[in-house]
């Protein structure tokens, strides 16, 4: 018998793709950065250190002073 895991993601909110873009009169512009490795959209994190992170390949760019 094969067990199928339960989907517990019903309570979590999903990312809305339309919030990633800024629409002007004749152009559409991406708000976030794109990953230089894989090309997916990167997330901007503020804590514990400010950084840009890719959830797909794990590439991370740290912003600000180094310790």
Swiss-Prot record:
Keywords: Metal-binding, Ribonucleoprotein, Ribosomal protein, Zinc, Zinc-finger. The keyword GTP-binding does not apply. Its cofactor is Zn(2+). Binds 1 zinc ion per subunit. Gene3D superfamilies: 6.20.50.180. InterPro entries: Ribosomal_eS31, Ribosomal_eS31_arc, Ribosomal_zn-bd. This is Small ribosomal subunit protein eS31. The lineage of its organism: Archaea, Thermoproteota, Thermoprotei, Sulfolobales, Sulfolobaceae. The gene is rps27ae.
């Amino acid at each position: 018998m094969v067990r199928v895991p339960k989907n517990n993601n019903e309570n979590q909110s999903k990312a809305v793709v339309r919030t990633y873009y800024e629409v002007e009169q004749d152009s559409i512009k991406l708000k976030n950065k794109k990953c230089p490795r894989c090309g997916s959209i990167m997330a901007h994190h503020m804590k514990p250190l400010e950084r840009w992170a890719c959830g797909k390949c794990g590439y991370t760019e740290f912003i600000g002073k180094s310790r």
